[in-house]
Amino acid sequence: MKMIYLRCKKYKINKLINLKNIDELGYKEFENTIYVRFHGKVYTLLELKPEDKAETVCTHILDEYINNSMTMDSFTIDVDDILKEIHDNK
């Protein structure tokens, strides 16, 4: 069973996502949120502050998923590391 452990100290979240049942992982630009869709229902994973762009964070999460999903059944995505990388590149 494929699982993602999503954690972020800045936003105080620790979430385990079962990828078997997921229909969609994406972002809502106007709300600056990252969400998942399970069986037609949308659940917000992360509400970001304006300086942390949901599009960029979501792209990094999807890249991590693509890079790890073929070789590992479960893996951790640390959103703090993604945010640090984004802000260091500014």
Task: Locate the predicted segments by residue.
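Eukaryotic intrinsically disordered, low-complexity regulatory linkers and tails enriched in Ser/Thr/Pro
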Residues: 1-16, 20-90
